[in-house]
A protein has these predicted regions:
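S-adenosyl-L-methionine
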Residues: 1-118
């Protein structure tokens, strides 16, 4: 089922995450592995970015597709991900473009840990 359309229904957009969060809480589910742009990520329902990916299969999809398209059309040696957070962009680009060297920077320790867990 394509869950992306659920983001556009106001009532569902608010209710759906609440119900899923409660289910995760009841069953004591912390992180769950989920494939996004053909890369596996460990996602936490309590993190807004990760919740959007998990529930709606969506997070900055237009920006990611724009980046992928432009990287396909040009010849780049490096990709710099400043403020990499959990590594979303770095891992997607690294998965699609093995010849590009990825340099990721993230100053926040908890985000660095998440990034390392996603490697």
């Amino acid at each position: 089922m394509n869950r992306k359309f659920l983001r556009y229904i106001p009532f569902v957009k608010r209710l759906y995450p609440s119900i899923v969060k409660k289910i995760f809480f009841i069953f004591n589910i912390g992180e769950i592995s989920f494939k996004f742009f053909n890369v596996n990520f460990l996602l936490n329902i309590n993190e807004p970015m990760e919740r959007d990916i998990l529930l709606f299969d969506y997070y900055e999809n237009e920006q990611i597709n724009f980046l992928i398209q432009n990287l396909k059309n040009e010849n780049f040696d490096y990709f710099f991900d400043i403020g990499a957070n959990s590594g979303l962009y770095s891992l997607i680009i690294g998965n699609l473009f093995s010849s590009i060297k990825i340099k990721s920077f993230e100053p926040i320790n908890i985000s660095i840990k998440k990034f390392k867990n996603n490697l």
